[in-house]
Each structure stands twice: as structure tokens, then as C-alpha cells.
Amino acid sequence: MTWLVPRYGTFSALTNISLGGDPAVAGNAFGQGSTWFSVLYHGEGTGTRSPVPPGYTGVAVLKFAAFQNGTDGLLDAVSGGLPGWVQAVQYDPESWDFTPPIEKGAWLYNPHPRVSHAELFCRKAHELGLAVVLSPSLDLCNNKPNPAYPGAKPQYPVAPGERNYEAYVRHRLASAARWLRPGDVYEFQSQALETDAARYRSVTAAVEAQVRDLSHGVTFLAGIGRTKANWDGATAAQLTAAARGVAPLVAGYWPNVDENATRVRTMIRFLQDLGY
């Protein structure tokens, strides 16, 4: 099983006994050496600490919300020097201020800037000898004005009656996997669908097919669990049903949980249900 685990968030919450966390369960799940531990870059330069917890082995991932934004994008970090522990870098563009508008609209190749930022990110990372994790958010598909483009038009619009995950599939955002190499990771943020196991599976299957058709040897992961801002009240049983439904399609999961006792206990029970 491959896991993609945020060090300061998911891991710290799941090992916090006061919140109902269980270090033994977390160790059983994430201590097998196949976990990719991540930390979001905030411009700390070479002083950024490795996300791999003491006593664990795994892949150390430095996560970015931008390719370049002048402060804490991948190119900004490279210009200041990457920490020596970095083994992989993650590109996590979302509909938030951390990702520049130009990048939100050019995840795939866009004729206006004449680039794909997913491609630029992968090329730079591979040039540096680093593995890559691509994890574009579903909310890149939206109808918000984008000031970086002519007429402020959204570049991945959602059609009337369509959901953003349907637009994600229609716009083929997962086709960015063409720029990944064997051993890299593509993660689908499927957690928005987790309370409906059938839908979770069908949409994840559509995304996995896009990844498989255009790449070779790429590790495909699915998101599971949500934090306060978007919490859906999912039970451990619902998370387990969703995860088991896509087990033939995925190599593992990106579990999301914040420091909330209800959500922590739910995620621990989910891990126990999976045998940890």
C-alpha cells in the first residue's frame, strides 16, 4: 500500500492521543517504508524540515501550490536552494490565492500563455533528479472569472447542470500524467465523492483510465477524508466502502484529516477497518 501523508496535519493528528489518535495504528499503516510524507513549502528555503517523522522511512516530499509565484513556488525554491532531503516534489494547484491565476488556467497546455504548467513543473523536477506528485484539485474546474486570460474567462468551465468532478473528467485534467515518469505519482482528489461509494468508484475509474492511457509505471492514488472547511460527515464505514470499491484501481490513498477529535477517530477506525 502506498500512502501520501501530510506530515503536519494528517500524520500529527492521527498520532495525537488527546484527539483519539493512535500511534500504533498510524505506525502500522504508514511505517512500511512506502509512504510519501509531504510538507507544504512556505518560502523557508533550505531550513525547511524533512516531513519524514523520526523512526519512519519513506519518500520525503516538498509540496508546492505553484510552479512560480515569486515567493514559494517550485522555481522560487530552486533559486534559493532546495533542502538536501528532498526526494520528490508535489504540484497541488487549487482555486486559492497560493496558485497564480495564470497557472490555474494552464494546468494543461493553453494557447494564451503557450505553456502547460504541469509540464513545466514535471520537466524542472525531472531535470533536478526528483520524483513528481501531481494532484490538481477538482476546483480548478469552475466558472470564476480568471483575470489572467482574455475577457477574464474561466479556462476549465463547469457546464450547466455539471459538477466540478464531471468537468475534471471532461477537460481531461488527468491527461497531465503524460509528463510523469515511471515511479512518479498521480493523485486524484476524490474525497469529495467519498460518501457515495458507487460514484467514488465510477469517477475514480474514469480518471484512472486517463492516467493509464497516457503514462507508464505511474502510481495512482485516491484522496480519502476531508477537513473542517469541506467536511461531509463521512463515517468510517463510508470511507471503508469507498476505499474498498476502488482498491483494484489504486495503489493507495491520500488521507486527509485535521486536528478534530471526531474526524481523527473516524480516520483511525477507517485504518483499522483496512487491517491496520
Kindly give the residue locations of the regions a language model identified:
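Glycan-processing catalytic domains of CAZymes
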Residues: 1-276
